[in-house]
Swiss-Prot record:
The name this protein goes by in its record: Energy-coupling factor transporter ATP-binding protein EcfA2
Quaternary organization: Forms a stable energy-coupling factor (ECF) transporter complex composed of 2 membrane-embedded substrate-binding proteins (S component), 2 ATP-binding proteins (A component) and 2 transmembrane proteins (T component).
GO molecular function (one): ATP binding
EC number: 7.-.-.-
NCBIfam families per the UniProt record, alphabetical: ECF_ATPase_2, PRK13634.1
SMART domains membership: AAA
Coiled-coil portions: none
Membrane topology term: Peripheral membrane protein
Organism listed in the record: Lactococcus lactis subsp. lactis (strain IL1403) (Streptococcus lactis)
Keyword ATP-binding recorded: yes
Purpose of the protein: ATP-binding (A) component of a common energy-coupling factor (ECF) ABC-transporter complex. Unlike classic ABC transporters this ECF transporter provides the energy necessary to transport a number of different substrates.
Domain ABC transporter: start-end pairs: 2-244
Length: 288
């Protein structure tokens, strides 16, 4: 689906202000997967994200998106199809809303790619239903809606482009806890339809709950990758890099350090932790 091969990126190359942001990045996003990218500010997440849909081109190396290969010498007309294949929901996407009505805003993208107004509005209606905004909202101004509803409109606008890959950049930033949970459940339901998802986040619990593969970035390098279940076993390594672990993993690790119980494999989700502690309780009860 998407493959990075030895990707390097330097801002303002061949100048006194040259600053290298990515170093020999090898990365793969498989079709139908839910891939997470984790890293602090300055880790290279944003730079990497902009390579996913051709906003940036590698200084060295290649980015393959389907059958399109992007290099340092690719022309804009060659890259444009990538932006239809990969839809990016940037942080606070509601700030990009501008049309008179919700329906018109969501239909704008497809029309911009040459689809008729009638067909674009049909697609927009379908995507608005998908994100949980019923017909009563469609003729309202997007600016009359709540923050969470506005974000859903913006997400529907990206989905209306029918991208093969949906990239989410800190998608729950600024939302209250209830809205955050609802938003993550929405993305999971979209993923369940077969949509390939890339989640850029610093929230380890979201990675544990939803992602099937994760890449950890630090200062432009991938320092670890694998399934969340495997990556989050390296508690000391992650703490050394100030990345932390899911709450369930932290609790289990602390419990293990007391000597009360040794886990064969640390749980990464609350459900896994509850199941393990329940089985421990049952086992202890049976031994008494």
């Amino acid at each position: 689906m998407i493959k990075f091969e030895k990707v390097n990126y330097t801002y303002q190359p061949n100048s006194p202000f040259a600053s290298r942001a990515l170093f020999d990045i090898d990365l793969e996003v498989k079709k139908g997967s839910y891939t997470a990218l984790i890293g602090h500010t300055g880790s290279g997440k944003s730079t990497l994200l902009q390579h996913l849909n051709g906003l940036l081109q590698p200084t060295q190396g290649t980015v393959r998106v389907g059958d399109i290969v992007v290099t340092s010498t690719s022309k804009q007309k060659e890259i444009k199809p990538v932006r239809k294949k990969v839809g990016v929901v940037f942080q606070f996407p509601e700030s990009q809303l501008f049309e008179e009505t919700v329906l018109k805003d969501v239909a704008f993208g497809p029309q911009n790619f040459g689809i008729s107004k009638e067909e674009a509005e049909k697609i927009a209606a379908e995507k608005l239903e998908m994100v949980g905004l019923s017909k009563e909202f469609w003729e309202k101004s997007p600016f009359e809606l709540s923050g969470g509803q506005m974000r859903r409109v913006a997400i529907a606008g990206i989905l209306a482009m029918e991208p093969e890959v949906l990239v989410l950049d800190e998608p729950t930033a600024g939302l209250d806890p209830k809205a955050r949970i609802e938003m993550m459940k929405l993305f999971e339901s979209i993923h369940q339809t077969g949509q390939t998802v890339v989640l850029v986040t610093h929230l380890m619990d979201d990675v544990a709950d939803y992602a099937d593969y994760v890449y950890l970035l630090e200062k432009g390098h991938i320092i670890s990758c694998g399934t969340p279940s495997d990556v989050f076993q390296e508690v000391d390594f992650l703490k050394a890099h100030e990345l932390g672990v899911p709450k369930a993993t932290h609790f289990a690790d602390q419990l293990q350090k007391t000597g009360v119980y040794t886990f064969e494999k640390l749980p990464i989700t609350r459900a896994e932790l509850v199941n393990l502690l329940t089985s421990l309780s049952v086992k202890s009860g049976g031994e008494n």
